[in-house]
A protein has these predicted regions:
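Extracytoplasmic "Venus flytrap"
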Residues: 47-72, 80-88, 110, 175-181
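An alpha-beta-alpha
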Residues: 68, 154-197, 201, 289-313
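Short beta-strand elements in bilobed, periplasmic/extracellular small-molecule ligand-binding domains
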Residues: 75-83, 195-207
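Short beta-strand elements at the ligand-binding edges of bilobed clamshell
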Residues: 136-158, 170-175, 258-271
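Hinge/cleft segment of the Venus flytrap/periplasmic-binding protein
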Residues: 282-345
Length: 345
């Protein structure tokens, strides 16, 4: 999905993300079992590493990183990571972790798919679990993706009901399947809630260029958009400045502009990370597609809390969203997976 090479920075203070250094795993000394004693050998922490092509503030890698920090606290893993790794350096970093005794390596392979798969094949005893547009490969390369089209659809319902100009927009990264399906799901919901809406779509050609995303959002607002899907960082800032409404993406970003951000689809990588870590710990790891762990029914995605908007959203809008969410969770309704180029009216 991602081939980011943009080094634009945004204020790291905006994101509640600690840059604390990862502690080295505290390995308990193995206790030799005396003949007939039954003493157990203390287990060493599972060594896990992540390799990210972008800064960890970027939404996609941020969510993976947050889940791995959670695994460090809850599952006791020894976690290290490398961020903003250029494509040309990806192979070296992967090899460094694999040769250093890392048992599970995660991250996004979109910037270096061929290299990541090649290195995985050369270290068959190391589990590789990467965001990828391809499938798993035996014996050790597993994949996942951000299947958050379901909450994106729910956000579209809200946008369709809340627009006053009958014009909604989306500023997104690139016209690739993983992005297109989110924008199309958003539009599906918006059209269902309001058949009269027009749609404005802009791709900025980067996964991390907040100034460019803001510029694109301002152009859409000037064209009449009054509810915008902020698929990339930078859009919410424009929406706040111009007094329109925004839908965030990947994480709960309400704190950036509480009066602007109604909600947004949240990608929770915890179910995926938990499943992968437990498999490796149990010695039961096999090459798999972990994609299903990102669906709402698995807890891998959900609608961000309304926060202050809970009191401001009309009751009929909240009921519409709640009813549709229930049908998604019970399996009686499926959101379309449309990876074609999103429309722009």
């Amino acid at each position: 999905m991602k081939k980011p090479d943009n080094r634009n920075e945004i204020s790291r203070a905006q994101f509640a993300l600690s840059r604390r250094q990862t502690l080295t795993g505290i390995a308990s000394a193995a206790v030799l079992t005396a003949l007939g004693s039954g003493s157990a050998v203390a287990a060493k922490p599972l060594k896990v590493a992540a390799v990210f092509a972008t800064p960890i503030e970027e939404p996609w890698d941020h969510q993976i990183h947050v889940a791995l920090l959670q695994a460090k606290e809850k599952l006791g893993i020894d976690y290290k990571w490398s961020e903003h790794v250029e494509s040309a350096d990806f192979e070296r970093v992967l090899r460094q972790y694999a040769r250093g005794g890392t048992q599970l390596i995660m991250g996004d392979a979109f910037a270096a798919e061929e290299v990541t798969r090649k290195v995985a094949k050369q270290f068959p005893k190391v589990a590789f679990v990467f965001g990828s547009g391809g499938g798993p490969a035996d014996p050790n390369f597993s994949v996942f993706d951000n299947w958050i089209h379901e909450p994106a659809y729910l956000c579209g319902l809200i946008a369709g009901k809340m627009t006053k100009t009958n014009t909604v927009g989306a500023v997104a990264a690139m016209d690739i399947p993983e992005v297109a399906r989110l924008v199309n799901a958003f539009y599906q919901g918006a059209k269902e809630a309001n058949p009269n809406i027009k749609r404005k779509t802009t791709f900025i050609g980067s996964f991390f260029d907040p100034p460019k995303a803001k510029e694109a959002a301002l152009a859409q607002i000037a064209a009449g958009v009054d509810v915008i899907f902020a698929e990339r960082f930078g859009v919410i800032e424009a929406a706040k400045e111009k007094g329109i409404l925004a839908i965030s993406n990947m994480s709960d970003q309400s704190e950036l502009a509480p009066d602007t951000v109604i909600t947004g689809p949240v990608w929770d990588m915890w179910p995926t990370v938990q499943a992968a870590v437990k498999q490796v710990k149990a010695g039961a790891y096999t090459a798999s597609d972990f994609g299903a762990f990102s669906f709402m029914a698995k807890g891998g995605s959900y609608l961000a809390p309304f926060h202050g908007w809970d009191a401001k959203l009309p009751a009929d809008v909240k009921k519409l969203v709640a009813d549709k969410q229930a049908t998604i969770l019970d399996g009686s309704f499926r959101v379309n997976v449309d990876e074609n180029t999103p429309p722009s009216d």
